[in-house]
Curated annotation (Swiss-Prot):
Similarity annotation: Belongs to the DNA mismatch repair MutS family. MutS2 subfamily.
Record-linked InterPro entries: DNA_mismatch_repair_MutS_C (IPR000432), DNA_mismatch_repair_MutS_core (IPR007696), DNA_mismatch_repair_MutS_sf (IPR036187), MSSS (IPR046893), MutS (IPR045076), MutS2 (IPR005747), P-loop_NTPase (IPR027417), Smr_dom (IPR002625)
Descriptive protein name: Endonuclease MutS2
Native organism: Streptococcus equi subsp. equi (strain 4047)
GO annotation, biological process: mismatch repair; negative regulation of DNA recombination; rescue of stalled ribosome
UniProt-recorded Gene Ontology molecular function terms: ATP binding; ATP hydrolysis activity; ATP-dependent DNA damage sensor activity; endonuclease activity; mismatched DNA binding; ribosomal large subunit binding; rRNA binding
Smr domain location: 703-778
HAMAP family, per database record: MutS2
Record keywords: ATP-binding, DNA-binding, Endonuclease, Hydrolase, Nuclease, Nucleotide-binding, RNA-binding, rRNA-binding
Tagged with keyword ATP-binding: yes
EC number: 3.1.-.-, 3.6.4.-
Gene3D superfamilies in UniProt: 3.30.1370.110, P-loop containing nucleotide triphosphate hydrolases
Binding site for ATP: G328, P329, N330, T331, G332, G333, K334, T335
């Protein structure tokens, strides 16, 4: 396709109108490279994709992909054995997340028959293992402590050192307060320092890091703090090195999959572009045209995409019609009509929807050529006529019967008689070689050519004789007529002068009268056609209303099913609460071992739905809807850490990737994140484990009950003790605070009646005092 016509038709500006509907950088890149093609099958495939995307939106009104960055350079760096940065890994993490979401979306897609898009969806791969590994980096770009045991250990040491440093500085701050210009801890060169009055600088031993502008204050790092800060600096260096090692390990995991990831990015970008085409089509009331088997075109209510509030026009370019000549004065809209045809054809051959009504038809041309506007070349010192003629010669040498040619003001810029003769000769050559051509001209001689010559048709732009303004209505089959006499008469020229002028051109006056009658007949035909179209639109609106009612009914039905599922869930929760009450009584008897009690509780939770609601179809549907799948993101309950499901094992057990570690989990040991029903389900009880640590006495854990209601605190405490017993923990810390003392007393009462608690008491004063209870288990 000739590049020049894309510039003349401002095709790049048309493509810019699709930008607001794109979500991915890959989709943007594909749009930027988009150009017209002459492969009919490929164009039809683009249109089929667009029609199938419309079908998807009927069922899923808010289908979206989410913003994706371009990862092509990152994949190239992986191929070159380079390690990715945190930002690059975040982009890959987002790509993996969107890939998994699109795979799940396609797996759940119903009531939509896909052919072209099916191949795209099915080629998208999900990588649950990689997705789980990249959970080690959160969305803010922070490498989580659970990314590796070494990083977690280093950060724990950093935290301890920082705490010790602050404590030491606070002690020095109190003792040396008299020597300080301000009672605060400052920072200089990455070190914690004290602002000491210059007159007392020798009273505070340490390293001077800075001095105030006035010289009255020096910033000293106390000697007692120097070694501690050096240890902290070394730990921070170790942290950076460990993060670098983790980034290297993550890059190594991604490296074998760089080609697949690059392919995923392209597939998602292409889906994004198809989605953008559909949204543009909806916003602009555009359509997917039919592709002709021959070279015929039919544009119904075609509009120019770059004009605000354009006038819609019909154009019929039959297969046996070679040339359309648009005659008439300037500023009537002839050039706009020419460009409207050109843009409709270029957009269609680029796989884009066109601004026209349904039923429009386009052809496929190997070449589209145009000579539009003033192409005068100052460098060649050519006149306007010479410039145009040079370009026309190039077009005539390149065009063939599979081409479309658009000429604006053919033959202009020279003697009118010679220009008209040249224009007719050029059009005749194109007619004889059967090359589809549309040309505009203001030469009246071409009207006769259009009437007398086979396979050539006249056309014009309508003019309002009352307002003396063009209407921009395209009148096919009607040559343009002169309005000079009417305009002169309405502007006040003496009637006898007008009549004398008309007498001088009596023949032309008769022709104009015939043309006027043709215009009137064309306008009446247009009105009848518009009435037919209005009836068709009413039918379409009725059809849409019926579909809308059906969809609303379907959605209402789904909401009722969801409501029933929630009610069923409440029944199950009540049953579970009653079972917890029974089991709490068993605790007091101490007849059962801890693991037997917990196992019995777990079995009761599993049996409750089947026993009480085994025949409830709504609940079955809800359970099926909430069932975990490979690739789902999860939260591991015991650790509060994110991961990804890799594979389903036997007995409802799952293999999961958590950071760089693989775990085997039961379904009740994790919860799904980002489920649609998450906001609607009743919140499940969860134990808030604040911290795990190791002591000489064996494993221990800590539970924080501050701010909890009585019932919630007791439920969490019960589950926490169960978990501690299962994990063979010998000692646990329960933080309840002091407050009104209600929770503290309830904790003591619970521990006294639990036969598996050997002893308990308040923590030492420096570890929480009466706000924390330490319990020994056995």
């Amino acid at each position: 396709m000739e590049k020049k016509i894309l510039e003349q038709l401002e095709f790049e500006k048309v493509k810019e109108q699709f930008w607001p509907y794109l979500q991915t950088e890959q989709g943007q890149l594909e749009l930027d490279l988009l150009e017209p093609i002459a492969n009919k099958d490929k164009i039809q495939a683009y249109f089929t994709e667009l029609e199938e995307m419309a079908a998807i939106f009927v069922e899923h009104h808010h289908f979206a992909l989410g913003g994706l960055s371009d990862v092509s350079e990152s994949m190239q760096r992986l191929d070159l054995e380079a390690d990715l940065s945190i930002q690059e890994l975040l982009a890959v993490k987002k790509l993996l997340q969107v890939s998994a979401e699109v795979c799940r979306f396609y797996a759940d897609l119903e009531n939509v028959d896909l052919v072209a898009l099916k191949a795209l969806f099915e080629k998208i791969e999900s990588f649950p293992s990689l997705q789980g590994s990249l959970q080690a980096i959160n969305d803010a770009g922070f490498v989580e402590g659970f990314a590796s045991p070494e990083l977690e250990s280093i950060r724990r040491q950093i935290s301890n050192k920082e705490h010790a440093s602050r404590q030491l500085l606070q002690d020095i701050l109190k003792k040396q307060a008299a020597y300080l210009s301000e009672s605060l801890i400052a920072s200089r060169n990455g070190r914690s320092v004290l602002p000491v009055k210059n007159t007392y600088r020798h009273k505070v031993a340490g390293v001077v890091h800075d001095m105030s502008a006035s010289g009255s204050t020096v910033y000293i790092e106390p000697r007692a703090l120097v070694s501690l800060n050096e240890e902290l600096t070394q730990l921070q260096t170790d942290e950076r090195h460990e993060i670098g090692r983790i980034l290297h390990e993550l890059s190594e995991q991604l490296r074998p999959h760089s080609r697949s990831l690059r392919n995923n990015a392209w597939l998602l970008g292409h889906l994004d572009l198809v989605r953008a085409k559909y949204l543009y089509m909806q916003a602009k009331q555009a359509t997917v045209p039919v592709i002709s088997d021959d070279k015929s075109l039919q544009l119904l209510n075609a509009r120019h995409p770059l004009i605000q509030n354009p006038v819609a026009n019909d154009l019929h370019f039959a297969n046996d019609l070679a040339v359309i000549v648009i005659t008439g004065p300037n500023t009537g809209g002839k050039t706009i009509m020419l460009k409207t045809l050109g843009l409709a054809q270029v957009m269609a051959q680029s796989g884009l929807p066109i601004l026209a009504d349904k039923g429009s038809r386009v052809a496929v041309f190997n070449g589209i050529y145009a000579d539009i506007g003033d192409e005068q070349s100052i460098e060649q010192s050519l006149s306007t006529f010479s410039s145009h003629m040079t370009h026309i010669v190039e077009i005539l040498n390149q065009a063939d019967s599979d081409s479309l040619i658009l000429f604006d003001e053919l033959g202009a810029g020279t003697d009118p008689q010679e220009g008209a003769s040249l224009a007719m000769a050029i059009l005749e050559q194109l007619r004889l070689t059967n090359i589809k051509t549309m040309a505009t001209t203001h030469y009246p001689e071409l009207k006769a050519y259009g009437i007398e010559t086979a396979y050539v048709e006249n056309a014009s732009m309508a003019f309002d004789n009352v307002s003396l303004k063009p209407t921009y209505r395209f009148m096919q089959g009607v040559p343009g007529r002169s309005n000079a006499f009417d305009i002169a008469r309405r502007l006040g020229l003496a009637e006898h002068i007008v009549k004398e002028a008309q007498a001088m051109t009596a023949t032309d006056h008769d022709v104009n009268r015939i043309i006027e009658q043709l215009e009137q007949q064309t306008l009446e035909s247009r009105k009848r056609l518009e009435h037919i179209k209005e009836v068709e639109q009413d039918n379409l609106k009725f059809n849409r209303a019926v579909k809308k009612l059906y969809n609303e009914f379907s959605h209402a039905k789904d909401k009722e099913l969801e409501k029933a599922a929630l009610e069923a869930r409440e029944i199950v929760d009540i049953a579970l609460a009653e079972s917890d009450s029974i089991l709490s009584q068993l605790h007091e008897k101490a007849e059962l071992k801890p693991h037997e009690i917990i196992e019995a509780k777990h079995r009761l939770k599993q049996l409750a739905p089947e026993q009480s609601l085994s025949q409830n179809k709504v609940l079955k549907k809800a359970k099926k809807w909430r069932a975990p799948r490979v690739g789902d993101d999860i939260i591991v309950t015991a650790y509060g850490q994110r991961g990804t499901l890799l594979a389903q094992l036997k007995d409802k057990r799952w293999e999961a990737q958590v950071g760089l570690i693989k775990l085997t989990l039961k379904e009740d040991e994790f919860s799904l994140v980002k489920l649609k029903e998450e906001a609607q389900q009743p919140k499940k009880r969860a134990v808030k484990v604040v911290k795990k640590a190791a002591t000489g006495k064996g494993p221990r854990a800590r539970l924080d009950l501050r701010g909890k209601r009585y019932e919630e605190a007791m439920q969490e405490l019960d589950a926490f003790i169960d978990q501690a017993l299962l994990n063979n923990m010998s000692q646990v810390d329960i933080i309840h605070g002091i407050g009104t003392g209600v929770i503290r007393e309830a904790v003591g009462k619970y521990l006294r009646r639990n036969k598996h608690v050997k002893s308990f008491g308040y923590a030492p004063q420096n570890a929480g005092g009466s706000g924390c209870t330490i319990a020994n288990l056995g």
